[in-house]
C-alpha cells in the first residue's frame, strides 16, 4: 500500500498523453489524424478509466485505514528558501477523484456522439483531456503553490471550452466575461497565498494550519489578527469567483454558450466544485476566524436565494440549470460556513451527479430540437418553443424527471439526503438563515418543475410560434470553429445528434462507442436497418426534415442511464441513521471516510440520527418542496391553460383590484429574474462605463495636457526662432558679436553666483 500512495502522483498525468499525441498526429500526419479523428475518443476514455480504477481502490483504502498520507519532494534553491512539491491523499482528495473520473468518463462517452458533427472534434477532446489533467492535479496538490498552478490551468481550459465556437460574437464575449471575472478572484487568491507565506513561512497545508492556529490563539496583536483575517478573505475570494458565488456569479449563465457536455462536466460537477474544494481544504484555517466563517455562511445564503429567484423566468434551458447550479453550490457554501463539513461534501457529491444528469438530458433535448430548427441555440435551447416532448423523447424525459425530483429534494433520491441535512443544521446555526434556506427549497422545486413542464408537457409549441426558419435550416453544416455555414446537404444522410454523412458504407456506426452495442432494428419500408439500440436512425433524402423531435442515439443515452443509477443510489453512502446497524455493519460510509478530516476540525465523528427524528424533520422540507411542485404544476401544466378558458374562472380571476396587484407583483418578479437581478446592468454602468470614462479622461489628459506641454514648448521654440531670425541683417560679423555678448553675460552671471557661494 505504501508504494501505491508513493507513486499516486502519476494519476494526475495519466490523461496528458491524449492531447500530446493528438498534437503530434496533427503535426506529423495531419490528413490521417483528421480522417481517423473519431478513434481518439477511445484512448481518452480508456486513460481516464484507468485513473478511475486507482481512485476507487484509493477510496476503499481510505475507508479502511482512516488516515492521511502526504509525500513531498523538496527543491532547495538556497539555504533560506526551498520549493516543495508533492501530493496529499486524504478523504477530500479521494472523494473528488471519484467525482472527477466518473463524471468525466460519462461526459467523454456522451461527447463522442454529441460532437460528432463538429469539425472541431479533435480540438474538443484535447481541451477536455487537458482539463481532466488539471483537475486531477488540483485535488491532489499538497500545498498552495501547486493548487494555484493547477487552479490557473483549470481556468485556462474553462476559457477555451466556453469559447469553443468563438466565431460567434456572443460566445467570445461569454468566455472573456468568464476569464475576467475569474481573474478578480484569482488575483485575490494569489495575494492571500503570498500574505500567508509572509506570516507563516510555509505553503504546506499541515505546517500552515499549525502555525496559523498558534498565531491566532497565542498572539493578541490586533494588527496580526486583522492581517490574517484579510489574507483569509482573499483566499476565499478565489473560491467565490470559481464557484460562481455572489457577487462574482455573473459569468456562469453566459458560460452556457459552450457545448453542453462542457456545462455538464465543468459548470456542474467539477470546475465550479473547485471553489468548494478550496474552502473545504482550508477549513481548518478558516474555522479559527469567526468573522470569515460568518462571511462564508452569509455569501452562501445570499447565493442560495439569489440563484433561485434568477432562475424563475429564464427561457434558455441551460441558463435555468446554470442558476440552479449557482443556488445549490450556495447550499454547499452555507454548510461550510456553518461548520457542517460532512453535509457540505455530501451535497457536493449528490448535486454533481444529479446536475450532470440534467445537463446531459438538456443536451439530448437540444439535439432533438436541432432536427427541427437547425443549428440555432436561440431556438433549440428556448423552452418557449418546446413542450410535448414526452412522447418523442421518452427515455430522456424519464432521466430528466428523476434528476429534477432529486434536485427538488424528493426522497429517496440523492439530493434529498444531503439537502435535508443542511436544512436541519441551519436551524441550530441561525433561524433567519434556516427560514431562507427552507423557503429556497420550495423555490427550487418550483423553478425546476417549471423547466420540466415547459419542456415535456403539453404540445410542441414551435408550431404555434411565429417561427420563420427555413425548411432546410436543420441541415446546416458546422464549421471548424463552430460558425454556422450556409452549405446545404444534398446527399442522403443519417440524422445523428446533428449530422453524420456517409452514403457509401451503410454499416458505419453512429459513433465510436456504438461498436460495443450491436442490435438490428427493423422499421418501415423506406427505412434501412441500422446498428443502435435505443432509437431508430433513418436515412433521409434531400428535402426531408423531421416534423417532430427524435430520441437521441445510444451513445448519448447510455451515460444518462448510468447517471440515473447514481442519482438513485449515491445518497445511500451518507444515510445518517444506523438504527438497524449491528457491530459488523456500518451504513454511514461517508462519516467513516471523513474521520481524519473531522478529527482535524475537532468535530464529533458519531452524529448518528434517530430515524424517527430524521423522518419528522424531513417531512417539513419535503412538504415545502411538494408545495413548490404543486404551484409549478398549477401555473405551467397544460390543464391550467384549459381551465383558464372557462368563462367562470376568467370572471373570478379578473375580478377586483387584487388581480391587478397580483399581475404587478408577477411582472416585478419576472423583470427581476429575466434581467438577472439587474446585477449585470449595475456592473456595466458602474464598472464597464466607469472604466471607459476613466480611460477617456486619461486619454484627454494625455493628449491635451501632457502632449500640450510638449507641443507647446516646440511651438514656442519654433515661433521664437522665427521671430529672432528677422533681428539679424544677414552679416556674419554681427552674429559673432552677438554670440560673444551672450557668452560674456553668462560668464558674469556664473562668476557672481560662484562668489556668493564661496563667501558663505
From Swiss-Prot:
It is found in: Plastid, Chloroplast thylakoid membrane. It is a multi-pass membrane protein. GO terms for cellular component: chloroplast thylakoid membrane. GO terms for biological process: ATP synthesis coupled electron transport; electron transport coupled proton transport. InterPro entries: NADH_UbQ_OxRdtase_chlpt_su5_C, NADHpl_OxRdtase_5_subgr, ND/Mrp_TM, NU5C-like, Proton_antipo_N. Keywords: Chloroplast, Membrane, NAD, NADP, Plastid, Plastoquinone, Quinone, Thylakoid, Translocase, Transmembrane, Transmembrane helix, Transport. Its EC number is 7.1.1.-. The keyword Translocase applies. It catalyses: a plastoquinone + NADH + (n+1) H(+)(in) = a plastoquinol + NAD(+) + n H(+)(out); a plastoquinone + NADPH + (n+1) H(+)(in) = a plastoquinol + NADP(+) + n H(+)(out). GO terms for molecular function: NADH dehydrogenase (ubiquinone) activity; quinone binding. NDH is composed of at least 16 different subunits, 5 of which are encoded in the nucleus. NDH shuttles electrons from NAD(P)H:plastoquinone, via FMN and iron-sulfur (Fe-S) centers, to quinones in the photosynthetic chain and possibly in a chloroplast respiratory chain. The immediate electron acceptor for the enzyme in this species is believed to be plastoquinone. Couples the redox reaction to proton translocation, and thus conserves the redox energy in a proton gradient. NCBIfam families: NDH_I_L (TIGR01974), PRK06590.1 (NF005141). PANTHER family: NADH-UBIQUINONE OXIDOREDUCTASE CHAIN 5. Belongs to the complex I subunit 5 family. This is NAD(P)H-quinone oxidoreductase subunit 5, chloroplastic. It comes from Populus alba (White poplar). The lineage of its organism: Eukaryota, Viridiplantae, Streptophyta, Embryophyta, Tracheophyta.
